[in-house]
UniProtKB/Swiss-Prot annotation:
Signal peptide positions on this chain: 1-19
Name by which UniProt lists this protein: Kappa-conotoxin RIIIK
Family: Belongs to the conotoxin M superfamily.
Keyword set includes Disulfide bond: yes
Organism: Conus radiatus (Rayed cone)
Keyword Hydrolase: no
């Protein structure tokens, strides 16, 4: 029985239980935490700010005249 205890102790020292991924360490959970942090381009300057695409907007509401000449928006 002592040989089994020594073997178990050696195995736990070589491969501790903390090496196993826990539920809180899953990538999906990390994504939810990042979304709750409210990281946005207004707070972080290294995110580039882009204007919305004219093709995704209603042309009558688009303030940019170049959007009305854009071939992808004429459909």
């Amino acid at each position: 029985m002592s040989k089994l205890g020594v073997l178990l102790t050696i195995c736990l020292l070589l491969f501790p239980l903390t090496a196993l991924p826990m539920d809180g360490d899953q990538p999906v959970d990390r994504l939810a935490e990042r979304m709750q942090d409210n990281i946005s381009s207004e707070q972080h300057t290294f995110f580039e700010k882009r204007l919305p695409s004219c093709c995704s907007l209603n042309l009558r509401l688009c303030p940019v005249p170049a959007c009305k000449r854009n071939p992808c928006c004429t459909g």
